[in-house]
Amino acid sequence: PVSAMIGKTKEDKAVKQDILKKHTLEGVISLNKDTFYRVGTNPCIAIFTAGEPHQADKKAKFINFEDDGFEVKKHLGLVETERAKDKRQYLLDCWRGKVADFPSSFMVETTVEDTDEWLHSFYYYNDEIPTEADFMNSIADYLTFEFNMITHGKGYLFGQKGGDGNA
């Protein structure tokens, strides 16, 4: 599960450190959250080369394969769509280095340390420039939030003097 790649506890961190001392992390593939439908786990696949210590300059691949071409259908569970085969092939082509210009939203190649989260989401930086509509929506959301806070007596959070004795 994804939680094993995060390493929150001391024990988890020690395990990750021990793994890299003896094995090379080649990459981690984050899977569709519905892969094990109704089980309640976020699955991933970690790929290692056994018996070779992980070198500090070794780049590992972190792939977001949550959109794998499978969908949950009512009364059927997880069902393969017509896109699944192409998505699987694209994953394999990226993994094998046959695709050089992959989007960072799909795959990131980077060096790792035992203290890092070994997940695509840890390394991914959204490099897309927001549209004007995205900006306007963010401003509208903020103004709605601020108005709501002020009307509920929390104007002091925004530097306003109010009847509540704050600010």
Residue ranges and their predicted role:
Residues P1-A167:
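A conserved structural/catalytic subdomain of Rossmann-like adenosyl-cofactor enzymes
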